[in-house]
Amino acid sequence: LHVTDDTRGGCQPLGKQSVRWKSAGCSYTRTTGIWQTVWLEKVSPQGLKKCRIIPDIDRGMLIFIPEFHSLQSGNALYIQVSSHGEICARTALPCSSGIPVELKIPSPVLWEPGKPHLYDVHYEVRNAGGELLDSVESYAGLRKCHVEGNRFYLNNQPVFLRLVLDQGFYPKGIWTAPSDEDLKQDIELSMKAGFNGARLHQKVFEERFHYWADRMGYLTWGEFPDWGLAFWDHSFGVDRKVDHYRGFSNHRSEWAAAVDRDFNHPSIIAWT
């Protein structure tokens, strides 16, 4: 494991750290170290690596696109969708990465602010003999986002976005929330003040924050931090020679990873 904290090199995404000693513009307190949840997990070599879930409310279905760590002939994926303990839909199919699987949901209940209904999703990977290789618990929300003219629509209905600008800073920990309750409390306070969501400003938020947003019906705009490229260095009084190709490549890979990680959260309605 190699970690490089290169704030001034111009090739590493900065978050929103200032390249100067003091905060300036939209660049704030510098931070270092591991600032989000990190863990080691033993996984099955033939288990489920990830699964994208695409809701389609117009056809009343959830579309699953699984990906596996490796493929073995005879392995099968079992998907079960339930609501309040009642099974809504299920299927079984040979394991194959990247192949969409459609599951029709009877009498679908939509996810929306005020009524954030979530479906429980259970995955199993079994070999040809029926042995359980992997088991994953997840959830999904049925919702649709689109724009008509200058209006935003959620589930085919116009919604006014009354959003706060959430910086994701904490008195204790700077970028790191002291506890799960602190993440939840930010959403609760915003909703009590009459807001229905937040623009998550220049920060890839903790996954647990998105979990609470999903559970509480809180709309969010996911946003990538400062690219770290030196477009405005002279105005900030810092002079750097920047490899823009390397910088853009780093930004592109980091941004793709962030979107991929948070793709399934129904509370995220836009990326900026």
Where are these regions (language model features)?
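Secreted/periplasmic carbohydrate-active enzymes, especially glycoside hydrolases
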Residues: L1-W212, M216-G217, E254, I269-A270
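Catalytic cores of large soluble enzymes that bind and process phosphate-bearing ligands
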Residues: C26, R30, D243, G247-N250, ...
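Active-site-adjacent "subsite" loops/lids of carbohydrate-active enzymes
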Residues: L161-R162, L229-W255
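Short glycine/proline-centered loop/turn elements that form peptide/ligand docking sites
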Residues: R208, F224-F231
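Hydrophobic residues in well-ordered beta-strands that form the structural core
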Residues: T220-G222
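Active-site groove signature of glycoside hydrolases
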Residues: E254-T272
